A protein has these predicted regions:
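Membrane-interfacial helix termini and the short, flexible loops that connect transmembrane helices
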Residues: 27-32, 60-65, 212, 220-221, ...
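Short, hydrophobic/aliphatic alpha-helical segments
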Residues: 236-248
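Active-site-proximal, well-structured secondary-structure segments within enzyme catalytic domains
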Residues: 115-116, 139, 144-147, 154, ...
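Second-shell loop/turn segments in exported
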Residues: 2-10, 123-127, 204-211, 228-233, ...
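Amphipathic alpha-helical coiled-coil segments and their boundaries
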Residues: 36-39, 116, 123, 134, ...
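Membrane-entry segments of alpha-helical transmembrane domains in multi-pass membrane proteins
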Residues: 2-12, 36-40, 233-236, 275-282, ...
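Active-site-adjacent "gating/activation" loops or surface patches in catalytic cores
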Residues: 190-228, 315
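N-terminal helix-rich structural modules
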Residues: 1-176
Length: 360
């Protein structure tokens, strides 16, 4: 991966998309009668080069979303959405899929039948059966939704990265475990700051909330984390409203009353009513235990000299202390066993035992 430059990604996407389009054209223009192999299997195998490029890029984007990587994502996302729509809304291609679906033959295995069913349903759920007018609406809605989803994610990341608290008083970090303090010092150094810096990123936020006794700073962190993208420069309110509206329009176009019903139609739950019933039952069965756990932590906090109401930003600290005292669980003692090299060895060993794979 160290040989890949950011400037390599967009040309790689363009080349892989071109290959995918050529593969689709070959299926559509095949003069032979549609069969499971020349249509369904061919569809399943197309796009593998693009999948490799997407897998590398989007995994690295999640891990290290630099402004340059985000710009690449903004540039390629419309192209990926256009390709997806051009495939699912291609009438000639769908006719071939439909022909195989309606006359599959007796020789298909269970796995083949599953692939055929999922391929056909995937086209239908992506607008293949819509009228030409509705197909154009579907294309517009899905394109805008894709752009909004990317903007939403970028705002969340930008807002998360924008909020930090820098501490220069050694007394305010003296109580923290070494691994927390060292991480904060490294963060400060990376930002060109003095002292120690805590951010909203989980590796920084979570241990600070668990080990710091500074309630004022923890309240600021908690409120910032729980109001992310609510107002300000990175506000996502209008994006969310528009995304919800577009999802409803897509669901209605495809014959579903809600987007939840559309998503659940090919899943075990099947519809929103089933999920709502499950959630209602889950709430009824678990609320008592959640309240009990909350009260237990509150009582423990008061036994430690805490006065007043235990607030949300207090829970992580007293929960961690309670676990350590009652169950002798100490995260700091476990960390030496979870160094990167140790974890990699463990993962590779497990892969060898389960699947016979060897990594060199």
């Amino acid at each position: 991966f160290d040989r890949i430059r950011v400037s390599d990604y967009e040309p790689a996407f363009d080349a892989a998309i071109a290959v995918s389009r050529a593969e689709i054209d070959a299926i559509v223009n095949n003069p032979a009668k549609p069969t499971f192999n020349n249509t369904i299997v061919a569809l399943d195998r197309q796009g593998r080069l693009l999948s490799r490029v997407e897998g590398i890029f989007f995994n690295l984007l999640e891990a290290d979303a630099t402004p340059e990587m985000q710009q690449v994502a903004e540039n390629v996302q419309p192209k990926l959405t256009a390709l997806s729509n051009d495939i699912s809304l291609n009438p000639q291609l769908f006719e071939r899929v439909k022909a195989v679906y309606e006359h599959p033959g007796w020789f298909l295995s269970k796995e083949d039948k599953k692939l055929l069913e999922e391929t056909y349903n995937g086209f239908v759920r992506s607008g293949a059966n819509l009228s030409d007018e509705d197909k154009e609406l579907y294309r517009q809605y899905s394109t805008e939704l894709s752009e909004l989803s990317l903007r939403f994610s970028h705002n969340v990341l930008a807002a998360t990265n924008a909020f930090t608290i820098n501490i220069t008083d050694p007394a305010q970090v003296a109580e923290l475990p070494d691994f927390v303090r060292d991480g904060m010092a490294a963060e400060a150094k990376a930002r060109g700051e003095q002292g120690w810096t805590v951010t909203l990123q989980a590796p920084s936020y979570v241990p600070f909330m668990e080990y710091s006794t500074n309630r004022e700073l923890k309240e600021k962190l908690w409120r910032a984390s729980n109001s992310l993208c609510l107002g300000g420069e990175f506000d996502n309110t209008e994006n969310i409203k528009r995304m919800v509206n577009l999802r409803l329009k897509i669901a209605n176009l495809l014959g579903y009353p809600t987007y939840a019903d559309y998503v659940l139609a090919d899943r075990m739950a099947e519809n929103a009513q089933t999920v709502n019933a499950f959630l209602g039952e889950l709430l009824a069965r678990t609320k008592e235990y959640a309240v009990k756990d909350y009260n237990t932590i509150g009582e423990y906090a008061r036994s430690q000299g805490f006065e007043g109401e235990v607030m949300p930003w207090d829970m992580a600290y007293y929960s961690e202390k309670y676990r350590h005292e009652k169950y002798e669980l100490n995260e700091e003692l476990v960390k030496p066993y979870l160094q990167l090299d140790s974890v990699k060895r463990g993962v590779f060993l497990l892969a060898n035992k389960l699947y016979g794979l060897n990594f060199t």
